[in-house]
Protein backbone atom coordinates (compact mmCIF):
# COMPACT_ATOMS: atom_id res chain seq x y z
CA UNK A 1 0.00 0.00 0.00
CA UNK A 2 1.52 3.35 -1.04
CA UNK A 3 0.41 6.80 0.08
CA UNK A 4 0.63 9.52 -2.53
CA UNK A 5 -1.23 12.73 -1.77
CA UNK A 6 -0.63 14.50 -5.07
CA UNK A 7 -0.45 18.28 -4.70
CA UNK A 8 -1.13 18.17 -0.96
CA UNK A 9 1.56 18.03 1.73
CA UNK A 10 4.25 15.99 0.02
CA UNK A 11 4.42 13.44 2.84
CA UNK A 12 6.79 10.55 2.42
CA UNK A 13 5.68 7.63 0.29
CA UNK A 14 6.29 4.07 1.42
CA UNK A 15 6.36 0.88 -0.55
CA UNK A 16 3.61 -0.66 1.52
CA UNK A 17 1.03 2.13 1.91
CA UNK A 18 -2.02 2.40 -0.46
CA UNK A 19 -1.21 4.20 -3.69
CA UNK A 20 -3.85 6.88 -3.31
CA UNK A 21 -4.35 10.41 -4.58
CA UNK A 22 -6.30 12.52 -2.11
CA UNK A 23 -7.15 14.95 -4.90
CA UNK A 24 -8.46 12.18 -7.17
CA UNK A 25 -12.00 10.84 -7.30
CA UNK A 26 -13.53 9.40 -4.16
CA UNK A 27 -13.98 6.04 -5.89
CA UNK A 28 -10.29 5.84 -6.78
CA UNK A 29 -9.51 6.33 -3.09
CA UNK A 30 -12.07 3.84 -1.81
CA UNK A 31 -11.26 1.25 -4.44
CA UNK A 32 -7.55 1.66 -3.72
CA UNK A 33 -8.15 0.79 -0.07
CA UNK A 34 -10.53 -2.06 -0.93
CA UNK A 35 -8.01 -3.61 -3.33
CA UNK A 36 -5.10 -3.42 -0.88
CA UNK A 37 -4.28 -6.72 0.84
CA UNK A 38 -5.52 -7.08 4.38
CA UNK A 39 -2.70 -7.53 6.88
CA UNK A 40 -2.88 -10.91 8.60
CA UNK A 41 -0.71 -12.23 11.38
CA UNK A 42 0.95 -15.63 11.24
CA UNK A 43 0.50 -16.46 14.93
CA UNK A 44 -2.54 -16.24 17.18
CA UNK A 45 -0.90 -13.40 19.11
CA UNK A 46 -0.29 -11.44 15.89
CA UNK A 47 -3.83 -12.03 14.68
CA UNK A 48 -5.30 -10.84 17.97
CA UNK A 49 -3.07 -7.78 17.83
CA UNK A 50 -4.38 -6.91 14.35
CA UNK A 51 -7.98 -7.29 15.57
CA UNK A 52 -7.22 -4.89 18.42
CA UNK A 53 -5.45 -2.41 16.12
CA UNK A 54 -8.32 -2.40 13.63
CA UNK A 55 -10.81 -1.81 16.46
CA UNK A 56 -8.64 1.06 17.73
CA UNK A 57 -8.57 2.70 14.28
CA UNK A 58 -12.35 2.40 13.90
CA UNK A 59 -12.72 3.83 17.40
CA UNK A 60 -11.13 7.07 16.14
CA UNK A 61 -14.04 7.53 13.72
CA UNK A 62 -16.64 6.75 16.39
CA UNK A 63 -15.08 9.17 18.89
CA UNK A 64 -14.91 11.86 16.21
CA UNK A 65 -18.66 11.48 15.56
CA UNK A 66 -19.56 11.53 19.26
CA UNK A 67 -17.43 14.60 19.93
CA UNK A 68 -18.73 16.44 16.85
CA UNK A 69 -22.36 15.65 17.64
CA UNK A 70 -21.88 16.70 21.26
CA UNK A 71 -20.34 20.04 20.17
CA UNK A 72 -17.08 19.12 21.93
CA UNK A 73 -14.53 20.98 19.81
CA UNK A 74 -11.56 19.92 21.94
CA UNK A 75 -12.70 16.32 21.64
CA UNK A 76 -12.94 16.59 17.86
CA UNK A 77 -9.42 17.98 17.66
CA UNK A 78 -8.06 15.20 19.89
CA UNK A 79 -8.37 12.68 17.04
CA UNK A 80 -6.11 14.73 14.74
CA UNK A 81 -2.31 14.70 14.54
CA UNK A 82 -0.51 18.00 15.16
CA UNK A 83 0.71 17.95 11.54
CA UNK A 84 -2.71 17.23 10.07
CA UNK A 85 -4.37 18.17 6.81
CA UNK A 86 -8.08 18.22 5.93
CA UNK A 87 -9.58 18.41 2.44
CA UNK A 88 -13.30 19.13 2.25
CA UNK A 89 -15.60 20.64 -0.41
CA UNK A 90 -14.63 24.18 0.69
CA UNK A 91 -10.89 23.69 0.34
CA UNK A 92 -7.78 22.38 2.11
CA UNK A 93 -6.96 23.14 5.75
CA UNK A 94 -3.41 22.50 6.97
CA UNK A 95 -2.47 22.39 10.64
CA UNK A 96 -4.55 22.10 13.79
CA UNK A 97 -5.36 25.80 14.04
CA UNK A 98 -6.91 25.89 10.57
CA UNK A 99 -8.77 22.63 11.10
CA UNK A 100 -10.04 23.82 14.48
CA UNK A 101 -11.50 26.95 12.87
CA UNK A 102 -13.21 24.73 10.30
CA UNK A 103 -14.90 22.58 12.94
CA UNK A 104 -15.81 25.53 15.15
CA UNK A 105 -17.69 26.93 12.15
CA UNK A 106 -19.39 23.62 11.31
CA UNK A 107 -20.47 22.94 14.90
CA UNK A 108 -22.05 26.42 15.08
CA UNK A 109 -24.35 25.59 12.15
CA UNK A 110 -26.51 23.05 13.99
CA UNK A 111 -28.57 22.91 17.16
CA UNK A 112 -28.32 19.13 17.11
CA UNK A 113 -26.58 16.75 14.72
CA UNK A 114 -26.15 12.98 14.52
CA UNK A 115 -23.52 11.26 12.36
CA UNK A 116 -23.76 7.65 11.22
CA UNK A 117 -20.65 5.99 9.72
CA UNK A 118 -21.00 2.80 7.67
CA UNK A 119 -19.02 0.60 5.26
CA UNK A 120 -15.89 1.21 7.32
CA UNK A 121 -12.73 -0.37 5.89
CA UNK A 122 -9.22 -0.37 7.38
CA UNK A 123 -5.90 -1.32 5.78
CA UNK A 124 -2.52 -1.25 7.54
CA UNK A 125 1.04 -0.65 6.48
CA UNK A 126 3.24 -3.71 7.11
CA UNK A 127 4.49 -2.52 10.49
CA UNK A 128 0.94 -1.53 11.58
CA UNK A 129 2.13 1.97 12.48
CA UNK A 130 0.18 3.57 9.60
CA UNK A 131 -3.34 2.88 8.35
CA UNK A 132 -5.93 3.97 5.84
CA UNK A 133 -9.61 4.03 6.76
CA UNK A 134 -12.51 4.76 4.42
CA UNK A 135 -16.21 5.03 5.25
CA UNK A 136 -19.56 6.41 4.16
CA UNK A 137 -21.40 8.84 6.41
CA UNK A 138 -24.98 10.00 6.77
CA UNK A 139 -25.68 13.00 8.97
CA UNK A 140 -28.97 14.39 10.30
CA UNK A 141 -29.06 17.93 11.69
CA UNK A 142 -31.39 20.65 12.92
CA UNK A 143 -30.23 24.11 11.83
CA UNK A 144 -30.55 27.21 14.08
CA UNK A 145 -33.79 28.10 12.27
CA UNK A 146 -35.13 24.57 12.98
CA UNK A 147 -34.81 23.23 9.44
CA UNK A 148 -34.17 19.48 9.48
CA UNK A 149 -31.65 18.33 6.89
CA UNK A 150 -29.70 15.18 6.08
CA UNK A 151 -26.39 14.93 4.26
CA UNK A 152 -24.28 12.06 2.98
CA UNK A 153 -20.77 11.52 1.71
CA UNK A 154 -17.47 9.77 2.39
CA UNK A 155 -14.42 9.86 4.65
CA UNK A 156 -10.89 8.86 3.63
CA UNK A 157 -8.45 8.98 6.54
CA UNK A 158 -4.69 8.41 6.71
CA UNK A 159 -3.72 7.64 10.31
CA UNK A 160 -0.43 7.15 12.11
CA UNK A 161 0.28 5.79 15.56
CA UNK A 162 1.67 8.26 18.10
CA UNK A 163 2.72 6.92 21.51
CA UNK A 164 0.21 4.09 21.18
CA UNK A 165 -2.70 6.25 19.99
CA UNK A 166 -4.02 6.47 16.42
CA UNK A 167 -4.24 10.01 15.01
CA UNK A 168 -5.60 11.30 11.71
CA UNK A 169 -2.80 12.99 9.78
CA UNK A 170 -4.71 13.38 6.51
CA UNK A 171 -8.46 13.40 5.93
CA UNK A 172 -10.62 13.93 2.87
CA UNK A 173 -14.39 14.43 3.19
CA UNK A 174 -16.78 14.43 0.24
CA UNK A 175 -20.27 15.90 0.37
CA UNK A 176 -22.46 14.01 -2.08
CA UNK A 177 -26.10 14.54 -1.16
CA UNK A 178 -28.44 16.75 0.86
CA UNK A 179 -32.17 16.57 1.49
CA UNK A 180 -34.72 17.92 3.95
CA UNK A 181 -36.61 15.89 6.56
CA UNK A 182 -40.02 16.11 8.21
CA UNK A 183 -40.00 16.74 11.98
CA UNK A 184 -41.50 14.20 14.37
CA UNK A 185 -44.92 15.15 15.79
CA UNK A 186 -44.74 16.68 19.30
CA UNK A 187 -46.10 15.00 22.39
CA UNK A 188 -46.90 11.38 23.21
CA UNK A 189 -48.29 8.91 20.73
CA UNK A 190 -52.06 8.25 21.02
CA UNK A 191 -52.71 5.37 23.37
CA UNK A 192 -49.21 5.38 24.87
CA UNK A 193 -49.11 4.42 28.57
CA UNK A 194 -48.65 7.23 31.08
CA UNK A 195 -44.98 7.41 32.17
CA UNK A 196 -43.92 7.09 35.79
CA UNK A 197 -42.08 10.42 35.62
CA UNK A 198 -42.43 13.47 33.38
CA UNK A 199 -38.70 13.67 32.69
CA UNK A 200 -38.02 12.45 29.14
CA UNK A 201 -35.08 11.97 26.80
CA UNK A 202 -36.01 15.32 25.26
CA UNK A 203 -35.37 16.90 28.63
CA UNK A 204 -31.86 15.46 28.49
CA UNK A 205 -31.20 16.63 24.92
CA UNK A 206 -32.69 20.08 25.28
CA UNK A 207 -36.05 21.81 25.10
CA UNK A 208 -37.42 19.49 22.45
CA UNK A 209 -37.57 22.27 19.87
CA UNK A 210 -34.62 20.61 18.09
CA UNK A 211 -36.93 17.79 17.09
Where are these regions (language model features)?
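Short beta-strand segments enriched in hydrophobic/aromatic residues
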Residues: 68, 80, 137-139, 172-175
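Acidic/histidine-enriched, glycine/proline-rich intrinsically disordered or flexible terminal extensions
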Residues: 179-211
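A solvent-exposed, acidic/Ser-Thr-rich amphipathic alpha-helical stretch
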Residues: 73-141
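Short, cysteine-centered beta-strand-loop-beta hairpins and adjacent loop/turn segments enriched
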Residues: 139-148, 179
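Short, low-complexity N-terminal intrinsically disordered segments enriched in polar/charged residues
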Residues: 17-74, 78
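Acidic, Ala/Val/Gly-enriched low-complexity intrinsically disordered segments
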Residues: 3-5, 13, 21
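Short, surface-exposed coil-to-beta transition loops
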Residues: 115-117, 150-155
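Short beta-strand edge/turn micro-motifs at domain boundaries
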Residues: 18-32, 37, 130-132, 152-186
Amino acid sequence: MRVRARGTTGRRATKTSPRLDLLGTMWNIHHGVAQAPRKRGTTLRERLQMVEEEAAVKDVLTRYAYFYDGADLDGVMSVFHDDCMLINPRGTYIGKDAIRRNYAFLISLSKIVLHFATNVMVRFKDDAEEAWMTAYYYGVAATPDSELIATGGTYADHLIKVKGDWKIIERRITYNLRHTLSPAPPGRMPGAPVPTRKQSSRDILGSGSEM
